[in-house]
Amino acid sequence: MKAATACIDLVALQHNLQLIKQQAPHSKLMAVVKANGYGHGLRHVAKHAVGADAFGVARIEEALQLRACGVVKPILLLEGFYSSGDLPVLVTNNIQTVVHCEEQLRDLENAELETPVVVWLKIDSGMHRLGVRPEQYQAFVERLHQCPNVAKPLRYMSHFGCADEMNNEMTPKQIELFLSLTRGCKGERSLAASAGLLAWQESQLEWVRPGIIMYGVSPFGDKTASELGYKPVMTLKSHLIAVRDVKAGESVGYGATWISERDTKVGVIAIGYGDGYPRTAPNGTPVLVNGRKVPIAGRVSMDMLTVDLGPDATDHVGDEAILWGADLPAEDVAQHIGTIAYELVTKLTSRVEMSYSE
């Protein structure tokens, strides 16, 4: 019997991609598959993301993995290249790059490349993480247009800081600034990621860049993906390896952080922080055992966690436990833990078995 297993529903992935296309019908779709496809398996996700027009990654190694497994669609390096030594690799493997700073621009100007590279100029429209500031924009555009190592036309992008907050005034300001700077430009543009394409239709430009929503996880704090019509792609499962009688007043686990208020049965599940399940999960965090919600009871260990099955439980060793998935949204689990579902799905360790269904 396997211990922790992440079951990846590739049919759900395809459903989600089709729904994205329906919601952004006039945009091309750049599927973001960074961080090992948000923990879902880079190669499997790319192979089955048949509705994608291109892929977005964070590291050059991810782009090379995609090329190695036969992906021929465009691939964009979302953080851009890290050093001038990366540029020949981009050319050889037909990888597009973001340019967001002076250092990258100088490397492009000084390089001797066999063919030009497709460049997306990243504009800092208000998030202040990466990108050229508005007052630098025109100078960057002129230098990129003059650079023989840059394929023409130049492309343009930015990123939202608060698109998941509908009442935040920052997003309309970012949209207005980006559109005003790029109005009349010949090159294609991209502004919306998951929250943007769902909540800010005016940000659906020539390209959208869905990430977390593609995997059936919501970018919003007040709605699950299921409530938006999307299907969770990952279900994290394990099983009971012990069912123990615990008396009222007895504690369970390291630090004795949970003390039973009644005679009950406690289930021990074969998963822990060594598998990527957060050690910070507090007492009360929900787990599904045989289809019903039961609370974590006691501190999460490296290889195990414990749940209060209740005094009348009839569960047995070997019974299934679901940590998150179709019937227990990762968003709900994350909220109990005080994190975001992005972190849950991307932090599973190599010890977790990956199982794919088509």
Swiss-Prot record:
SUPFAM superfamilies assigned: Alanine racemase C-terminal domain-like (SSF50621), PLP-binding barrel (SSF51419)
UniProt enzyme class: isomerase
GO molecular function: alanine racemase activity; pyridoxal phosphate binding
Organism taxonomic ancestry: Bacteria, Pseudomonadati, Pseudomonadota, Gammaproteobacteria, Vibrionales
NCBIfam families per UniProt: alr
Cofactors that this protein relies on: pyridoxal 5'-phosphate
Residues noted as binding substrate in the record, renumbered to the chain: R129, M302
Organism: Vibrio vulnificus (strain CMCP6)
A GO CC term assigned to this protein in UniProt: cytosol
Domain of life: Bacteria
Keyword Isomerase recorded: yes
Protein's name in the database: Alanine racemase
Modification type N6-(pyridoxal phosphate)lysine: residues: K34
Pathway assignment: Amino-acid biosynthesis; D-alanine biosynthesis; D-alanine from L-alanine: step 1/1
